[in-house]
Amino acid sequence: MSSKVSIIIPALNEEDVLTRTLNNLTLLNPPPQEILLVDGGSQDRTVEIAHKAGIRVLASPQSGRSIQMNLGAKAATGKILCFLHADTLVPNDLTAIIEQVLAQPNIVAGGFISLMTASNQTRWATSFHNYLKTYYAALIFRPHLFFKGLRILFGDQVIFCRRQDFWHCDGFDPELPIMEDADLCIRLCQYGSIYLVDRIVQSSDRRVAQWGEFKANLIYLYIGCLWGIGVSADYLKQFYEDVR
């Protein structure tokens, strides 16, 4: 029997990592209700790989993670939405974990501990910093909400929530080119607590590999601090170039 979870994958030129991710999803028990890949105009084999895997493919009229994820959420039929990056591997019991967490009515959304990995190494320092950021970003910049259950989750943590709650707060802000996930967490928090699941998902270290670990963490910290004091996402985007 399948779960009530719709998995939504925003993608743009992800042929190098997508096959591995889709193969990983075939191991889920119970299987998701559906998997939707929302393509932002890929120029490689991303769409072909998704079609061969037998998953539903949506073509977004514009690229942009917020826009693509909202399009997937509108098309989804599951009662629960799970937003998965194309370079992230999840545990085989992902759907069971999600349904168990959201069975608690006081929890509105959740995510996982992201471990940044490559084929031959694990980025322990960056992964630990990202784990701490879930807590300290909320505590420092939104302390009144932290004590109401706010945790700041990012896309590589595989954010999930009820479809009803997602649309109650109008989904992802399509105007945000960056920090759309943190913004969503703040708006979702009005409906309940955000829960960090004590399980690991594995994300590609490709951005850290290109920037270097010190520079990457410095940029993450810089962007987070500026966002926390209200600097516009359009300005912050210049520091976070796309990496494939």
Set out the residue ranges of the language-model regions.
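Glycine-rich, basic loop-to-helix element that forms the pyrophosphate-binding segment
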Residues: 60-76
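Short, flexible, basic/aromatic active-site loop/helix in glycosyltransferases
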Residues: 112-119, 128-152
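Short, acidic, metal-binding catalytic loop of nucleotide-sugar glycosyltransferases
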Residues: 24-32
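N-proximal low-complexity "stem/linker" segments adjacent to membrane-targeting elements
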Residues: 1-24
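Acidic donor-binding loop at a coil-to-helix junction in glycosyltransferase catalytic cores
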Residues: 178-184
